[in-house]
């Protein structure tokens, strides 16, 4: 007799066998589900407080996705040998899970909810993000917490004209698309993707395909709920105080309508704050007022005003129609000593973007569960509080900044040159200096221009545009290049980035159900129109990549040596390569296949380092004349160094055409002579001749007191061969 009441559901999902179970582990949580997809095992748990905190004004949902190194059979690095702060990858997956879950909690539900997902076992070929999202959704579904789920999710690839369901990492390597879609049985809620310049039709088809395929997971979750679900919470939203709403509306609606005729963001924000203060003051004359309730009512009035204006065909907040992109200004090369820079301004959104070139040593080393790998392209997004005219914390990046940076990176990856064509590592940093919507897409545009300014041979210009949607029954309006307020008050925000040939990144967040395939089709077509307009502005500002790198960027040269020679270049304990680096001022990297990359801002230093490495690794050629010092005198000849680490024997009989009695009569240690390589045996022993070199080049050698002097009639310049 077991103490556990387990419920297990198994199903085939594409090429994967999936198992969901609950009732054995984490029984004190509100809900816990373990999902196993071909040995990638994750545990999703949820706990919610039974009541909201007094004065709570927002829904406090937190989602934490945590990877445990034991899942991959590893012990963590570092002094403490335990997991530390979440990695960038963990943060991104936490956001990925949060986005489709958040809209499904009912309005007015302000209880704290915490979703925690642990990765317990990892199959390196099966990514853990989709299992994690399924586990979180299932845990919420069985918990009884008010939640309009369950949510399903699917990864979609695209290869050879066919969509792939939940491709493995091996399959992803040849896929032109990496798209994750999440939603309910009825509607899509979230899309995140990276694509290789695919058409709008292919992208929309992938979204629809993914939504169809996720129904298998949703049905399995519903079956699990039927068998093991907890009773639904007895929760209802607090009834609305209609008389109070009417009172606030009477005070605020007219001045708010007036405020939304102000086109400039700063002036409009000041006016809205002023109206809020005035309304609060008038209400407080009649007694105590719940500030949270008043702010909620004011938000609803603002949403009604803005949405109705747009749906009625009136101008938007800043005076534009639904299809117009804000004015764009672009300036390249704005910073004198950076490798590449661009200032991209679109209306009241501005990004100062800087590109920096580095060597292989500058690549980011990522120690992921599935194994360590290196990333040669980094994109970092920063938005300080002054960008919106506010004060606030400045420090390490927040989740939003990490997410925006990854979106911009996804948009630019498809146009980057290969490492073979451009050996540099690249870091792009977007500093948002002004923000009124669409700052991540401004970062895409600025990032592309900054790389072009740095001389990175990108395959095409990439532009991004943020779109919005207002939906009311059968009426809808798609908005191009949305403002911050339009994002806040709208029903969908989606960002599309790409080239003139197709989409490279698509991110979509939908706050309501009822958005159809036809609406998404209209939205994507309008986004393409906006993207092409922005691309034309970018091409006007910078038509092609700079042909010359910045004077402050490192120059690089790559060449091959025989892998067997690597240890000679490195030297004992790294002594040789360290000396080379110090003496030439160059950065030198050697790969296991013998590829040597030298980087330096000095052309002379780079040339010297290359020559010295070639000297160290050079093979002696029979018949070639070399110049080198006499390193040791012997009774029967002398040892002469002709290449780094390579000494040859100059026999006494090969010193002169005349009979030589004593070697020291003709040669001295340290004396530089020119000798011809006569032969090299299998053991690498070299036989040299001074008289043969003299015969080829002209000249004589005569005995001197203490040392010999070479008399060359027209001795060739040092380093030349016959």
Curated annotation (Swiss-Prot):
PROSITE patterns named in the record: KH_TYPE_1, S1
The protein's enzyme class: transferase
UniProt-recorded Gene Ontology molecular function terms: 3'-5'-RNA exonuclease activity; magnesium ion binding; polyribonucleotide nucleotidyltransferase activity; RNA binding
SS bond list: none
Residues engaged in binding Mg(2+): 487, 493
GO cellular component: cytosol
One matching Pfam family: RNase_PH_C
Name of this chain's protein: Polyribonucleotide nucleotidyltransferase
Gene name, Swiss-Prot/TrEMBL: pnp
